[in-house]
Amino acid sequence: FLRPLGLRLKEVSSNFGNMDGVNATFTDNQILYNYPIESVFYVYNILTGENKLIESYSAYTQNTVKPLATAVNDYSKWERHGLENPHFYEVMYIPKYKMYMRLHLKETEFDKNKSVAELSDNRELYLTCWNESFQFLCEVMLPGHRYNYYTGWCGLYDGLLLYVNNTTSKDELNDLLKIDVVRPITK
């Protein structure tokens, strides 16, 4: 039997280019969801129906995306808009440590003399971590010119797997599958 959930989904307009979708992660009793356009995220408890806003702000990047002045169907404007604003990815649950992790990209200045791929792969990538109660633990910048920013990661039972494949790193461009796994330091 199906029942509607009390998710408070936003209507995100096309004024945000290709950042108008919702990211969702499912755990045993929760649905975590967020939007690429803002640093905050939401937690819906499947058992109680409670919907909670988690206010989490980056110390290193903008925390909200500025909309395009008008809705446009020009993909090159969407690409530029995407580069000049941060991009917040899904919140992932790491069961072994009962913690949550999220990646996000810092905004960058558009340079018409560089390709979109070069500008994209030169962006700074940040990892933010929270404990099981969604209390902030840390925010760190990951090594530059190392990772694939287009779904080049996944949450694991005991960490975050990142694919080592960035077009700006000549050392990492080959046919071998290379990965890094980020795990918390425990005592």
Which residues does each PLM region occupy?
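Loop/turn-rich, solvent-exposed surfaces of beta-rich toroidal or solenoidal domains
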Residues: 82-132
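Surface-exposed loop and turn segments in beta-propeller and other repeat-based domains
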Residues: 1-18, 52-83, 140-148
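Hydrophobic beta-strand positions that form the internal "hydrophobic ladder"
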Residues: 30-32, 100-102, 160-162
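Loop-centered beta-sheet repeat module
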Residues: 1-45
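Beta-propeller blade signature
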Residues: 38-49, 116-135, 174-187
